[in-house]
């Protein structure tokens, strides 16, 4: 089943489908468009033709094997084994898998990856070109080797120990440490309580290779494996290849029984407080575990129950949102929902993030809302909105079924194999949902609360900072008991069915039309000077996008109003619009798939919007209201502000925020306009200032350019644009942004900053900044340089040295306010290895300057860029971005002469020359965060 979480549907007029009678007791069939079978050795396969993206395919190896299958001396080796699958197989020694695929533009990390969980390990090769002779066969051979032919050489095992140790270090944050304190209580008496996937560093560093090989032999076997191949392929041909390649793999003799893992039931309520020095929020959760039927065949009754669960969750979410919009919110965030938790178990989760030292108030409030639902259930009006909103989403999904990606299908088949999650295909699910949803009643959904919210198998979990005031077990249980016996009023559902705009709009005529042949688009200038650029694009069948901008942005605001300007976008969106607060507006938009939000950057202001073709008019109505009738709701402002103040109150303890804030100040040379969010920043955010800034920036529509791209008729766009955008006020104001002089420090900046890390690590940041002409040649050269650096650092710092889990490289060129380029390089590592590893960062750069990149690295990078470019052409967003860039920057990036031809003509000598011109003479900021002594 496609998991359209938290959305449900209502029967309305739909495209005509052949009507089927669904019996709830019948088993849900597998999508008939997927070819499936089981080989004699027990391996399962799923093969499907799909063309999103065209000329590409994805290959998945699904292992029903995870961390729960480890012995104590193997703690962490399921994950270790996942790494080893990329470090030598029978047919691809060493880094042969990566090198082979990267030569065809298939990138490690993004297209070549894997994950390990408690119960499964899944490998993927994604977006592999199918037009290259033999590449499909190569990928099948890789899956074949992953099944049974890993080399697991001692040399490669030893080389990978450092990488995984550094992954452990990188992932060891407050959230991870807190979870390791409360999981043993929640899962008491089960194997879930003693495994965390990443494992024990002692085992990682010192296990005997034979121990890893034993785990591999015991569990990587054909009866616990499935492969999924989805893409632009001939299914019959690929199925025959699968039989030929995979059938000879021998089944393991005397195979161990694959255990399932149970969590002991308990009548008493468990309780745990988990604290950490770096934790920034206090959270109270109540988990009620319930065994489910994962791994068993599913009937349509199960599918119906999943819909009921989704309906339930969407309605509870709406109630919590409404609670947080008014007065003084009792908590920062909260939820009361039912969902899947771990394999074999669902959990009813009641969670609230508390205001500082106010856990009692948060717990009582979220338990009160939960008890209100349990006692009184939901109103029919709530249910009808939830159904209608689901229909809108599902109908859009159905119309765009040709845009369901290869990877989405492959992941769906993985879930089907591992847990038997229904996967009937969008056609069957669409038809079934339309038949069953009208039969679901509010009483039926409400009854679920009484089934799910109970006392047994319940655990209270409190997490937060070490020095905060936390509830005791007695206090928490007392609050729950109090709520269960207190008087609670039923929820009253307010209607929201008024029209967005009641007045008649005069609009404006089109005074000039210009064809944009290079984009197959048209530009209209309206009588109020609004510019509208439209391109019909039907790559996404049920989508229309809108982007608008005007020069100015927050650069027009003086320094003392920067905090208000910085928060304007977030707060104005929370106020609602016109006469409607945010909750009323959300109810009014029931059944419409439409979003509009104002945007503010340092140099521009504008709007982002999206809708279906049928909701396009509503999108323009919202734009009109945001211009002409913006809403400024002080109660909503104060409610949101109190949540922000509570949220950041303990952020000063978060090493990640400390580092990010420090870098922000250092890279701006401590410019007075540059500030980071802290209590003083929020103190300077003023409601009246936000109103003033917004009204100053979002006015004079004649200074705005609107881009509309999507699957909608041009005449419809013309009519509605002239009516709504043509009715916007033109103040005949000409303005531009202001260069406020925010620049990086000149020369070389070296800083070593001590940080209190709970888990010792160093964080290295190297940033180069230099003036460079903004043109398409330099934009592409920078992309190629970044790709080459990614490859070099993966090989030298990660693989050869085992020094880090990964080096992240970021790059970009800016045109305004000055033409300038930047390259950022960052990684975590063992503090004792900082200088050695950092020297490799500079060595690789110097090597490119002195010798140029290698042919291999250059060709891999260019191939990847060309592959991604080809895929992007088949999406509406490509044309939206191209049009915007053309107007804003003056470059037609859609023209092959400005991309494909430039890349194909580029040489590694060009990159060597570009690297020299950029790095030599660049400002350098070298910042290392190290643990305090």
Question: Where do the PLM segments sit?
Answer:
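Proteolytic maturation boundary segments
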Residues: 18-47, 234-298, 302, 306-307, ...
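Hydrophobic, small-residue-rich alpha-helical packing segments that form membrane-like cores
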Residues: 156-211, 215-224, 229-230, 235-243, ...
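Non-catalytic, conformational "gating/processing" segments within enzyme and secreted inhibitor domains
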Residues: 149, 154, 161, 175, ...
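Sec-dependent signal peptide recognition
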Residues: 2-10
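M16 family metallopeptidases and their MPP-like homologs
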Residues: 48, 53-70, 77-78, 95-145, ...
